[in-house]
Amino acid sequence: MTEMRCRILISQTVSPIKVGITACSNPHPVSFRPELAVLQQTLRELGQESVCSPYLFSDEYGLSGSGTDRADALMQLFHDPEIRNIYDISGGDMANEVLIHLNYDEIRESSATFWGYSDLTTVINAIYTRTGKPSVLYQIRNLTGDDAALQQARFRNEEELFHFSYDFPQGTSMSGPVVGGNIRCFLKLAGTPYF
């Protein structure tokens, strides 16, 4: 059995790794800028230098680019060979708008791992279905939330972030890929080439 290893690459003894921050779903209000600055500083302290999509913040109508625009911004991050992780800081209802505009062959070849949650479940599962490449169901904004100290400690230690305690109600083991996430959003993929 091959164990999936995500490319976190966190170390205080090497130069910072490059990561992307994007929003494939609902954008944040402009008032979120200070929180983004705190997140970027936290990532910097964790050895990660970030570059941002131009579609993080909403306009006067609550939107930020079309599905095509947001997909193009995501693909630019996947194209950058220096980017190791792409953190989507959005969530809501609009992530499925990007699916038909993504180049899955280029995503497969990219060294970057996609991270997101909520309706980013659609992007995570589309990437897996179309490329076989794993993503991470995690909201990077947890690093600056109410449990920031705990989340940052887990983030620094890959074992704590990806290996956790559990009990089997029946049997003693299982194997295979884990898919899913937000079930409402996962079901949006039913009957599509992304399911």
Regions found by a protein language model. Name each.
Residues 132-194:
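Conserved anion/nucleotide-ligand pocket segment
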Residues 85-96, 117:
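N-terminal glycine-rich "phosphate-gripper" loop used for MgATP/nucleotide binding
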Residues 83-85, 109-114, 175:
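Short active-site oxyanion
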Residues 9, 24, 102, 124-125, ...:
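Mature catalytic domains of secreted/periplasmic carbohydrate-active enzymes
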Residues 2-82:
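ATP/NTP phosphate-donor binding region
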Residues 104-126, 134-141:
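Short, acidic/small-residue loops that bind anionic groups at enzyme active sites
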Residues 91-93, 120-121, 183-184:
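Short glycine-enriched loops at secondary-structure junctions
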